[in-house]
A protein has these predicted regions:
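Glycine-centered coil/turn sites that cap beta-strands in beta-rich domains
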Residues: 1-15, 37-41, 60
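Short, surface-exposed loop/turn motifs with a glycine/proline- and acidic-biased composition
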Residues: 27-58
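A structural signal for beta-strand boundary/capping segments at domain termini and interdomain linkers
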Residues: 22, 61-63
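Interdomain boundary/hinge segments at the C-termini of tandem beta-sandwich modules
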Residues: 68-70
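Terminal processing/anchoring signals of secreted or surface-associated proteins
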Residues: 1-3, 20, 41, 51-53, ...
Length: 70
């Protein structure tokens, strides 16, 4: 998972299961402009299935699906 912002702003990157339960917060801070932020998520302890990551910034919310299959 990665993101890059065009201007400095507060960013929150979270992983959720499909029931809406927060699984993990990966980032919760001010993100610098033009910096590339990359995260590795270890889902080895989670059951197989579809999960969501949500990036919330001062200007937008982006939600994407991903799968865990062991």
């Amino acid at each position: 998972m990665s993101f890059e912002l065009s201007e400095e702003q507060t960013a929150l990157l979270e992983v959720y299961d499909l029931s809406g339960r927060l699984v993990q917060t990966l980032f919760n801070s001010v993100a610098s402009a033009e910096a590339k932020y990359r995260f590795t998520f270890d889902g080895s302890a989670l059951p197989n299935g579809v999960y969501l990551y949500r990036l919330t910034t001062d200007s937008e919310v982006v939600i994407e699906k991903f799968m865990i299959a062991h």
